[in-house]
Amino acid sequence: MKILVTGGAGFIGSHFVTSLISGDIATPQPVTQVTVVDKLGYGGNLRNLAEASADPRFSFVRGDICDEGLIEGLMARHDTVAHFAAETHVDRSVVASGPFVASNLVGTQVLLDAALRHHIGRFLHVSTDEVYGSIDTGSWAEGHPLAPNSPYAASKAGSDLLALAYHQTHGMDVVVTRCSNNYGPRQFPEKMIPLFVTRLLDGLDVPVYGDGRNIRDWLHVSDHCRGLALALGAGRAGEVYHIGGGWEATNLELTEILLEACGAPASRISFVTDRKGHDRRYSLDYSKIAGELGYRPRVDFTDGIAETVAWYRANRSWWT
């Protein structure tokens, strides 16, 4: 398998690449080439790929997925695509949506067109539960209507639909995955867990939006990578698969866990004005990937948080 990984210097992408190279996740064929293309924006970091870069099968190309000439040349040398590259921060999308439309929608279109021309064997499109909006009770199944509430979520919903349309129109071998909120080492400190952990380690307060009762399901990045490998290897073309973590908590409950893990007092909580379009609750039903492909999350949340906090303690130079 010669796989092109877009956004592979980012948080989830770099964990996926490292797991591919190390053999920690199973693949349908032996991995003979792993090429990462990443523009190295604020969320991308070559240090995330230090382990993978020592392997002769690995190569890195700095570039933008919207660059048609670059993508055309790369696609010609690969037979599989794992598409992680995206602008992903809701707050940034509220302030300026243009980069999200460009990267998440137009960039995906550039990749799909090139993949179609070069008869790519499988195109794995990595997405998010945020495309569904908010759910008060129960959990979303894959067939639930999309109802994104932020520009970021809307751009991802559009890219999902575009990828699936290439399967319907052209018969392209596309699989879409949608995941819960990820956490783990090497996550850029704009997302809640690394933001709060790094602020607490620096002796600062942590900003909790609104009343703190928004609910999220949390997924360790290693579990996500295992789910992605299953979808890549055995998922049915044209299908969507949910990859969930199975651990829900309010933001306030999560904050209290992080305070304890970092040895900080409750006085470090600072309630701030809620953000625009803040979804109240996310919850994915991942019984489809469990039943078809045997996926189960393995990382206990308490253990995962302890590992994550320990990593940020030990790697201050990475985030300062």
Swiss-Prot record:
The reaction(s) this protein catalyses: dTDP-alpha-D-glucose = dTDP-4-dehydro-6-deoxy-alpha-D-glucose + H2O
GO molecular function: dTDP-glucose 4,6-dehydratase activity
InterPro entries per record: dTDP_Gluc_deHydtase (IPR005888), NAD(P)-bd_dom (IPR016040), NAD(P)-bd_dom_sf (IPR036291)
Residues reported in the UniProt entry to bind NAD(+): 11-12, 38-41, 64-65, 84-88, 103, 152-156, 182
Cofactor: NAD(+)
Active-site residues, record numbering mapped to chain: D129, E130, Y152
Keyword hit for Metal-binding: no
Alphabetized UniProt keyword annotations: Lyase, NAD
Binding site for substrate: 88, 128, 181, 191-192, 207-209, 216, 251, 274-278
Cofactor details (free text): Binds 1 NAD(+) per subunit.
Function: Probably involved in the biosynthesis of the acarviose moiety of the alpha-glucosidase inhibitor acarbose. Catalyzes the dehydration of dTDP-D-glucose to form dTDP-6-deoxy-D-xylo-4-hexulose via a three-step process involving oxidation, dehydration and reduction.
The name this protein goes by in its record: dTDP-glucose 4,6-dehydratase
Organism: Actinoplanes sp. (strain ATCC 31044 / CBS 674.73 / SE50/110)
